[in-house]
Amino acid sequence: MKRGALAVVLVISLVVAACDGSAVDSTTAPSAALVGELLVSAAASLTDAFAEVEAAFEAANPGVDVVLNLGASSGLREQILEGAPADVFASANTSNMDQVVEAGEASDPAIFVTNLLQIAVPAGNPAGITGLEDFAREELLIGLCAEDVPCGQFALEALANAGVTPSIDTNEPDVRALLTKVEAGELDAGITYVTDVLSTGGTVGGVDIPEDDNVIAAYPIVALTNAPNPAAAAAFVDFVLSAGGQEILARYGFVAP
């Protein structure tokens, strides 16, 4: 073979080898794992369920540290609109989520569970509460959530459906604060969610509200537009919507939409 032809063959061989090497590297390189802190702002009624969701998600993604920010949905909404860092927002109603979307902080939220209201009473129901009509009895100590939070809005809607004008002694900042007062015997009754009564393991009793008067609370979730950790935020939302996430939520009394 002539010297010039040999040189051409060697150059071609080196180019092919280089291409083959780069192809192998690109196909065998591992995909980046989810890492970092994940800030989840969630309604107070999700406290127990999301604690288990957090543990399950972290077990599947050991590089992620989920930080739950729990409270009234209206307060969480304000935090987000005022620029507080958050990756995921899970609200106990659609109106707070709608305001976040309208402000350009999120898009395409998904309803992931529903919930129903229930009258919460101290263990043994010492005041003998039988229904919403008892909320008009001035001699009883009655509590609701504040009117600007979902559980308060839904409670007033249920009372209106039943034609009851309530005699209210306290309005609590979120559903867990109301539940705590009922559990301590400081109130004869309050209106919470079915899931909150269930979470006490029997230290709070529940009186059902008739279907015609009750209100279905739809819970939306979304990865926020300005999420500091967008990849983990999207993965967390996907997990909540997955069969595994729904199984966890069902154990706490939530119902799939």
Label each PLM-derived region with a short phrase.
Residues C19-A59, D65, S74, E78-L81, ...:
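Exported/periplasmic ABC-transporter solute-binding proteins
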